Amino acid sequence: FNYADSVNCGKVAINTGGDAVHLKRVLACVNKNQIAAKKFRVVLDSVNGAGARPGKKLLSYLGCRATAINDMPTGLFAHKPEPIAENLTQLCDMVKRTGADVGFAQDPDADRLAIVDEKGGYIGEEYTLALAAKYVFSHTKGPAAANLSTSRMIDDIAAAAGCEVFRTPVGEVNVAQAMMQKNCVIGGEGNGGVIDLRVGPVRDSLISIAIILQLC
């Protein structure tokens, strides 16, 4: 370790503007007014993780009538944190009870998103990236990147749009590096992780939410 003496110690700075910077980039990627005009009824399950606060802000900015569950970012997970069907029964039931148009489930660090349809049915995580790619390709032509464990749905969607998919080894960093090298317009992993370089070279459930609502 390199130790600093008392004169050269670093300083701790608190940045409270992270949500605003992040959400500004997300909102720039979609048509806020078009989404708001539809007045979507949304249930958001943030599993008491990091996505609760910015997730609720995003839905508010997009004019959604949102019901938030497990939205206290204590880190004490309300259910098993993996956003798979067996762990999202509360979300599915809430969508049905409230007559919501869609339900969204974030994982604890908010880089993955699972979707529940208007009937309370769980949509597999593989569909998150596929649906995001479908929307992006309809507006922007360019390559995509996905790891080798991701469904071929993205290949079929890309082919229909006349676009190419670059495959990478498993690992978010490998996908992100390929996207930056190939100037990809969308990318991610089949676990519900979508990467949009307009927001940043990382998986992000917030851009996923915005794109899915724009697609609806």
What is the predicted function of each stretch?
Residues 44-47, 70, 106-108, 146, ...:
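Active-site flanking residues adjacent to catalytic metal/cofactor-binding acidic residues
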Residues 53-57, 78-82, 113-118, 154-160, ...:
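Short acidic, glycine/serine/threonine-rich loops at helix termini
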Residues 101-102, 140-216:
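Phosphate-binding and adjacent anionic-ligand microenvironments
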Residues 63-69, 122-127, 162-170:
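Short hydrophobic/aromatic-enriched beta-strand-loop microsegments
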Residues 24-27, 53-56, 60, 88-96, ...:
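Predominant activation on well-ordered alpha-helical scaffold segments within soluble catalytic domains
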Residues 1-98:
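Gly/Ser/Thr-enriched, mixed-charge loops and adjacent short helices
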Residues 70-74, 127-130, 169-174, 191-192:
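Short, acidic/turn-prone active-site loops that include or flank metal/cofactor-
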